[in-house]
């Protein structure tokens, strides 16, 4: 009788863990950056958790064809790859840019070599951060202002391709994100 109870207890525990794990996964946050509306929205499923207004993006707008140093924000789907809490921009949420689509376009357009394409592909396949120093650019993220000028932030798109919030906003955003959080920039 005790063996049956122990087995049932283990089965019940396993079911609880599976249900809780799937609910946690379903309840995970994702970020949508709308470059046209200049907003960053935190979503959980179809529910809006928080929208940050008046974000800043790259000083020369947005693109699907990013090049290193073009000061444009790359459009696409990424994940938060790392979090730097000691950044000159206060806090930096590094994105897994370039993604496979950017690498494919870069190879077709001959902006990157086949070896660079393979490196990006391998890193993404292994769940690692793709190479950040290719002709496609890198070190794209969501960050605060650091010691930057709030007036400039409120009036201009000023970044080198990143998405910028105020320091207070990035602090608030941190409660919903972690390494692995999906980020769509559109």
Which functions belong to the PLM regions below?
Residues 2-12:
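Bacterial N-terminal signal peptides that target proteins for export
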Residues 10-20:
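Bacterial N-terminal signal peptides
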Residues 26-29, 36, 53-82, 123-127, ...:
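N-terminal post-signal-peptidase region of extra-cytosolic proteins
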Residues 33-35, 48, 73, 88:
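Short, surface-exposed loop/turn motifs at beta-strand boundaries within globular domains
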Residues 35-55:
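N-terminal targeting signals for Sec/Tat export/insertion, comprising classic cleavable signal peptides
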Residues 43-45, 83, 175:
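Surface loops and adjacent helix of pleckstrin homology
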Residues 51-53, 78, 91, 140:
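Short beta-strand segments
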Residues 72, 86-186:
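Exported/periplasmic cell-wall-interacting domains
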């Amino acid at each position: 009788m005790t063996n049956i109870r122990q087995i049932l207890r283990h089965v019940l525990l396993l079911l609880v863990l599976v249900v809780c794990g799937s609910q946690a996964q379903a309840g995970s946050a994702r970020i949508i950056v709308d470059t046209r509306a200049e907003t960053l929205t935190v979503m959980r499923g179809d529910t809006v958790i928080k929208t940050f207004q008046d974000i800043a993006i790259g000083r020369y707008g947005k693109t699907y064809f990013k090049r290193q140093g073009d000061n444009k924000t790359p459009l696409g789907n990424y994940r938060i790859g790392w979090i730097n809490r000691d950044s000159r921009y206060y806090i930096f949420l590094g994105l897994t840019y370039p993604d496979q689509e950017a690498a494919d376009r870069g190879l077709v357009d001959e902006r990157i070599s086949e070896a660079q394409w393979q490196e990006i592909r391998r890193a993404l396949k292994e769940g690692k951060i793709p190479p950040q120093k290719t002709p496609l650019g890198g070190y794209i993220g969501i960050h605060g202002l650091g010691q930057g000028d709030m007036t400039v932030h409120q009036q201009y798109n000023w970044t080198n391709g990143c998405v910028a919030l105020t320091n207070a906003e990035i602090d608030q955003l941190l409660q919903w994100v972690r390494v692995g959080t999906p980020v769509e920039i559109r």
